[in-house]
Amino acid sequence: MKVLVDTNVILDVLCNRKEFVADSLRVFQCCEAQRITGYISALSIPNIVYIMRKELDTEKIREILHTLTMVFSVVELRESDLLKAAELPFDDYEDAIQSVCATRVRADYIVTRNEKDFVNSPVQAISPTGLLKQF
């Protein structure tokens, strides 16, 4: 199974968001163990760094980036992705980019806590909890 993991799920783990960390961490671990083929979009990386920069030093951020690129394949952004995303019926351009990336890698799901934001995505959105129920 191939999944594109949305930025919020990664941040649940990195920020230890009590309400969400358990299932998000299990998804992360399934990708790490290669039980699931995990992808993140290149867009997620600068967003993660931007959010984490206030709490972590540069070295720790480098370690996190190294770990992320070991666990997940990073889907590069192409000019055509940006243009396709702009044409999709999404309220949020970043979500549209995630959808385009998921489509390009033929992901089975977009793993996100914001399923409602992806109702117009050709790739079905699923919560971490929903994904884990399939195992």
Residue ranges and their predicted role:
Residues 2, 71, 103-135:
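Acidic, PIN/NYN-like endoribonuclease modules and their adjacent C-terminal/linker elements
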Residues 10, 45, 82, 118, ...:
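A generic structural signal for short hydrophobic patches within well-formed alpha-helices
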Residues 25, 45-73, 80-81:
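Active-site-proximal, substrate-binding regions of enzyme catalytic domains
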Residues 29-32, 66-70, 86, 103, ...:
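Alpha-helix boundary recognition
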Residues 3, 41-45, 78:
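N-terminal alpha-helical segment
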Residues 1-40, 53-60, 120, 135:
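Short, well-structured N-terminal submotif of metal-dependent ribonuclease cores
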Residues 39, 75, 126:
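General small-molecule cofactor/ligand-binding pocket signal
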Residues 73-115:
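Active-site neighborhoods of divalent-metal-dependent phosphate/nucleic-acid chemistry enzymes
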